[in-house]
Curated annotation (Swiss-Prot):
The keyword Protease applies. It is found in: Cell membrane. Its main location: membrane. May be involved in the proteolytic processing of a quorum sensing system signal molecule precursor. Keywords: Cell membrane, Hydrolase, Membrane, Protease, Quorum sensing, Transmembrane, Transmembrane helix. The keyword DNA-binding does not apply. This is Putative AgrB-like protein. Its EC number is 3.4.-.-. It is a multi-pass membrane protein. It holds the Pfam family AgrB. InterPro entries: AgrB. GO terms for molecular function: peptidase activity.
Length: 204
């Protein structure tokens, strides 16, 4: 029994503690949905705490926030790949939002570099956004067109922010976070990771 328990993910064990199965004894499907949702929340909270805890301890909090917000700003409408395993997701998050800010924090960029980089990013948004996954197919051509348009507008807004911000090192961190999102929507990344691209085609 102890061996089995040890193999159960921490998030699942915490979800079992937080919700009472007895209250859902007449609705097994409802219980599983609530439990799954709670597990996702717990996983994200723990991952967030780990990433930002390390960033805080290492003095990288501002750098981590800059890279992360730039990434999330573009990801909101362009979507892209997700890691299929929690451990992989956590390790990738640490590399993207702790290691990368550490490496690039003291590298300055000028506005010509910003314009060139965001020109490349905008082109990728035009060509590849939004990119879906097997678990989240983006169904509906008009829906995808709307997301693409919003992703491109978001890119232009972020370009303006990067151009206007007076700190050369901050410009670099904004570009790093944005390029991470470009990688997540590029079909070459899907191919290298052997993930299915254009998953919506299966449903249309």
């Amino acid at each position: 029994m102890s061996n089995f328990t040890a193999k159960v993910p921490l998030s699942e064990r915490m979800a079992d503690v937080l919700i009472s199965k007895d209250r859902w004894k007449d609705d097994e499907e409802g219980y599983l949905k609530v439990k799954y949702g709670l597990e996702i929340i717990l996983i994200n909270v723990m991952k967030f705490a780990l990433v930002y805890g390390i960033a805080l301890v290492t003095g990288l909090l501002l750098q981590t926030v800059t890279v992360h917000l730039s990434y999330l700003w573009l990801r909101r409408y362009s979507f892209g790949l997700h890691a299929t395993k929690t451990l992989n997701c956590t390790l990738i998050s640490l590399m993207m939002f702790v290691l990368a800010p550490f490496v690039f924090q003291n590298i300055p960029s000028n506005n010509w570099i910003v314009l060139g980089t965001f020109g490349f990013i905008l082109l990728n948004m035009f060509l590849f956004a939004p990119a879906d996954t097997e678990s989240l197919p983006l169904i509906g051509e008009e829906h995808r067109k709307t997301l693409k348009r919003k992703a491109m507008i978001g890119t232009l807004i972020l370009t303006g922010i990067a151009l206007l911000i007076p700190f050369a090192e901050m410009k670099t961190l904004i570009m790093v976070g944005s390029l991470f999102q470009v990688i997540s929507i590029n079909p070459l990344t899907y191919k290298l990771l052997k993930r299915r691209y254009r998953n919506y085609e299966k449903y249309e």
